[in-house]
């Protein structure tokens, strides 16, 4: 019976892969995954290198069940860390579904929906046979909280009996091990509500897996749940990609910029740890006769999507200058990657952008100063000690070596140091999460005090960049102290919120945010913009904390003086913060 299922499964994979103009490669870990699913495992850890086809492996069993009209799962919920990854995965899954409708008999009525935290003028529930969403939306709405921004509601019934894919989980890692301390108990609650969960990444830390297993070992309700571990074994699965040569270089990437650009094969990817240094590099290179592209998280949505689309279309590009946003979701084969040093799991993801289909070379510039204020010092010191060029070269195609490198850095001592400053915060959140299934409707007061940190140790705020005419109207409407409404044709308002938004992650420590401050009557204030059927509404806040506490869904207005462009090319919100003495 299983052998018959294998043949049918591979026909789905073949159809999807060939539609993407790729060659079919029958990896053994696909079959191992399908087998543990068929055995009824509730939780599966899947680790395989980037570019090995993990997405096709997890999609196939669900799509096949639709053809047979005997659903194994009520729906499929595909979860990504960021909204840009949600949008990219939505397009990818839609293409896979469409080709399967045409050639394999998937029902035409199949619905694919998504929510990536962006603006949505109509507020439906997060429904669909296949739903792509973010970790934040999944978890906040699962617990009954509406988070900041425009997030669709997810009903508990959507989770029951669904297949939930937790992808690119490594991108949740933060400087305090905060998300990874909470995630095991969130997963436990999803399992208790009848979901099947697949957790997958190229770099899964052993301590995260152990934390999840520990959470499952506690409680009578969880006793019948079973988990499986699937890893791509390099002795069985040789990932088809080019050979990668990694070299550690002394010094700073920014100091060697021209040397790297002029002396290495294109296309070339340059990865910086901060937006400021990425923009500075772009300024230096824009005079060169090279097709250069800048990509980071603080560029308005419409511009960022256009640039990301260049990769999917396969348009020729010489140099891409980017930040951490390229660590996942970019399907482009770079001949050369040059990066600032970053934590070992981050480095493996960065190196994975190179030599995907042909041989390539990667350079890691090892000046630890370039990681300060961005990554934890103890993690960076241990990463530096574990910069093994040969192992890093192999890590992009060998999941076992990637695991060894990651686990050498994220030891118990290192993780305990990361958690030490937020230990009490973690305890407060877990006091709500752990007993959730038994006390679903208790302690609603938790929302006002703690819910904003249910997953991440920061607050994400949505921002909007207004054209000069609307920005002036927004200021004038507040100065008038009357009606704060701005008349605007409906379609233009929808376009504005859809295309001119971006997000900023605010640390919990106090900082100034001049990019969101506006001068009104000799006083600095924050302004938020709200969408209505009749146009726009502007509201004023003396402190950003006031806006956050109200849990409003308005977008904070960006001071246009801080959003930079060069001859119409968006550099983005380069320096939104003022850390002062912090």
Tell what function each PLM region has:
Residues 41-61:
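Walker A/P-loop
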Residues 259, 280, 284-287, 296-308, ...:
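C-terminal helicase lobe and adjacent C-terminal extensions/tails of nucleic-acid helicase motors
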Residues 2-47:
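Conserved pre-motif I regulatory segment
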Residues 138, 150-192:
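SF2 helicase catalytic motif II
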Residues 112-122, 273-276, 292-306, 321-327:
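Conserved helicase motor
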Residues 98-146:
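Inter-Walker segment of RecA-like/P-loop motor cores
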Residues 72-97, 204-208, 275:
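Conserved Walker A/P-loop ATP-binding site and its immediately adjacent core
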Residues 206-262:
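Interdomain hinge/linker at the junction between the two RecA-like core domains of SF2 helicases
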């Amino acid at each position: 019976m299983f052998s018959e299922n294998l043949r049918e499964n591979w026909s789905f994979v073949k159809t999807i892969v060939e539609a993407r103009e790729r060659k079919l490669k029958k990896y053994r870990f696909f079959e191992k995954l399908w087998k543990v699913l068929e055995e009824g495992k509730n939780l599966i850890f899947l680790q395989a290198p980037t570019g090995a086809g993990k997405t096709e492996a997890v999609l196939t069993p669900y799509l096949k069940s639709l053809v047979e009209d005997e659903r194994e799962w009520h729906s499929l919920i595909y979860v990504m860390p960021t909204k840009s990854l949600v949008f990219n995965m939505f397009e990818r899954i839609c293409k896979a579904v469409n080709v399967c409708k045409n050639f394999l008999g998937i029902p035409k009525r199949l619905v694919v929906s998504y929510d990536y935290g962006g603006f949505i003028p109509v507020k439906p529930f997060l429904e669909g046979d296949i739903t792509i969403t973010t970790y934040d939306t999944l978890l906040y709405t699962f617990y009954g909280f509406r988070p900041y921004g425009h997030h669709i509601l997810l009903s508990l019934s959507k989770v029951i009996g669904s297949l939930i894919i937790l992808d690119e989980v490594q991108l949740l890692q933060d400087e305090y091990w905060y998300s990874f301390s909470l995630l095991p108990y969130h997963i436990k609650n999803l399992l208790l509500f009848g979901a099947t969960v697949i957790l997958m990444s190229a770099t899964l830390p052993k301590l995260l897996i152990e934390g999840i297993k520990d959470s499952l070992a506690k409680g009578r309700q969880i006793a019948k749940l079973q988990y499986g571990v699937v890893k791509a074994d390099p002795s069985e699965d040789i990932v088809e990609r080019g050979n990668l040569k990694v070299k550690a270089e002394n010094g700073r990437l920014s100091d060697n910029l021209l040397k790297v650009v002029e002396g290495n094969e294109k296309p070339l990817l340059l990865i910086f740890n901060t937006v400021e240094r990425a923009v500075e590099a772009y300024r230096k290179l824009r005079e060169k006769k090279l097709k250069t592209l800048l990509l980071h998280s603080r560029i308005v949505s419409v511009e960022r999507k256009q640039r990301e689309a260049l990769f999917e279309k396969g348009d020729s590009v010489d140099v891409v200058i980017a930040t951490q946003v390229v660590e996942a979701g970019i399907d482009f084969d770079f001949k050369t990657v040059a990066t600032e040093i970053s934590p070992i799991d981050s480095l493996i993801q960065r190196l994975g952008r190179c030599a995907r289909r042909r041989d390539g070379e990667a350079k890691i510039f090892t000046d630890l100063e370039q990681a300060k204020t961005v990554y934890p010092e103890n993690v960076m010191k241990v990463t530096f000690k574990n910069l093994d060029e040969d192992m890093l070269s192999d890590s992009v195609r060998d999941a076992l070596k990637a695991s060894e490198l990651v686990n050498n850095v994220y030891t118990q001592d290192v993780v305990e140091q990361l958690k030490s400053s937020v230990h009490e915060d973690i305890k407060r959140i877990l006091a709500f999460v752990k007993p959730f299934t038994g006390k679903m409707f208790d302690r609603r007061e938790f929302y006002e005090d703690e819910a904003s940190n249910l997953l991440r140790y920061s607050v994400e705020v949505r921002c909007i960049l207004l054209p000069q005419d609307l920005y002036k109207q927004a200021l004038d409407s507040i100065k008038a102290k009357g009606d704060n409404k701005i008349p605007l044709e409906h379609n233009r308002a929808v376009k504005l919120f859809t295309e001119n938004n971006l997000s900023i992650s605010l640390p919990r420590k106090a900082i100034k945010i001049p990019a969101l401050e506006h001068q009104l009557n000799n006083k600095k204030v924050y302004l938020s913009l709200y969408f209505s059927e009749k146009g726009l509404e502007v509201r004023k806040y003396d402190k950003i904390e006031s806006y956050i506490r109200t849990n409003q869904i308005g977008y904070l207005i960006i001071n246009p003086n801080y959003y930079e462009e060069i001859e119409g090319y968006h550099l983005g919100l380069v320096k939104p913060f003022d850390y002062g003495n912090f």
